Swiss-Prot record:
Top-level lineage group: Viruses
MF (Gene Ontology): RNA binding
UniProt xrefs under Pfam families: Flu_PA (PF00603)
Gene3D superfamilies named in the record: Influenza RNA-dependent RNA polymerase subunit PA, endonuclease domain (3.40.91.90)
Signal sequence range: none
Site residues, Important for efficient shutoff activity and nuclear localization: 195, 198-199
Domains: entry comment: The probable endonuclease active site in the N-terminus and the basic amino acid cluster in the C-terminus are important for the shutoff activity. The C-terminus acts as a nuclear localization signal. The C-terminus is recruited to host protein complexes involved in nuclear Pol II RNA processing.
Function field: Plays a major role in the shutoff of the host protein expression by cleaving mRNAs probably via an endonuclease activity. This host shutoff allows the virus to escape from the host antiviral response. Hijacks host RNA splicing machinery to selectively target host RNAs containing introns for destruction. This may explain the preferential degradation of RNAs that have undergone co- or post-transcriptional processing.
Protein name from the UniProt record: Protein PA-X
Active site: 80, 108
Annotated source species: Influenza A virus (strain A/Korea/426/1968 H2N2)
Length: 252
């Protein structure tokens, strides 16, 4: 799984995931499924915000090629991936500027067009189950929830999907590609099932001669949100940098 992640995700996303796991004492060589899940969630957050801007008239537009002469503002503020202190600083600044209610938990994005925080979910299970879990945890009508699955399903608060169909289709296609490439490598079952993940982990460690003394239980604890965001993600060049990660994963 680790090799798969390094092959199929943008190196910057991999680096952010590595830093996040290290910060919280998680070993990516053991928690490989978590490593893949963090990378996937972070990529979806960036794909969600990518290409979307607000023009001088306050209208939401899509721009795939940056025009240095255009006075555009990113429609979405990315909160996911920042260190905790900076993330809350950004949230507080948004609340002070817009009058939005401060969320209890750190959200993933802020939508300047709709003036609301957004929580993004990527699930290997039924979308409605994961949506209810998110809603029960957040317990706030002011944070918009949008859930994607690897099967192309999605669910959002009040069926308001925020993005246009083309943008959402791009995210769904990427998730479906990840699923297919995992399946081609025999990794999908272990990614979905903790029981299968345990078997795969023991098999991998045994083949490396590292099985002794290592845990055999796979943690089901939810990973904390990524806390580190490189400055490059917020500049005008992030579109070009991310574009490489939309490509199909290379096959072995």
């Amino acid at each position: 799984m680790e090799d798969f992640v390094r092959q199929c995700f943008n190196p910057m996303i991999v680096e952010l995931a590595e830093k996040a796991m290290k910060e919280y004492g998680e070993d990516l060589k053991i928690e490989t499924n978590k490593f893949a899940a963090i990378c996937t969630h972070l990529e979806v957050c960036f794909m969600y915000s990518d290409f979307h801007f607000i023009n001088e008239q306050g209208e939401s537009i899509m721009v795939e090629l940056d025009d240095p002469n255009a006075l555009l503002k990113h429609r979405f503020e990315i909160i996911e991936g920042r260190d905790r202190t900076m993330a809350w600083t950004v949230v507080n600044s948004i609340c002070n500027t817009t009058g939005a209610e401060k969320p209890k938990f750190l959200p993933d994005l802020y939508d300047y067009k709709e003036n609301r925080f957004i929580e993004i979910g990527v699930t290997r299970r039924e979308v409605h189950i994961y949506y209810l879990e998110k809603a029960n945890k957040i317990k706030s009508e002011n944070t918009h929830i949008h859930i994607f699955s690897f099967t192309g399903e999605e669910m959002a608060t009040k069926a308001d999907y925020t993005l246009d169909e083309e943008s959402r289709a791009r995210i769904k296609t990427r998730l479906f590609t990840i699923r297919q490439e995992m399946a081609n490598r025999g990794l999908w079952d272990s990614f979905v099932s903790p029981k299968e993940a345990k078997k795969q982990l023991k098999k991998d460690l045994k083949s490396q001669g590292q099985c002794a003394g290592l845990p055999t239980k796979v943690s089901r604890r939810t990973s904390p949100a990524l806390r580190i965001l490189e400055p490059m993600w917020m500049d005008s060049n992030r579109t070009a940098t991310l574009r490489a990660s939309f490509l199909k994963c290379p096959k072995k």
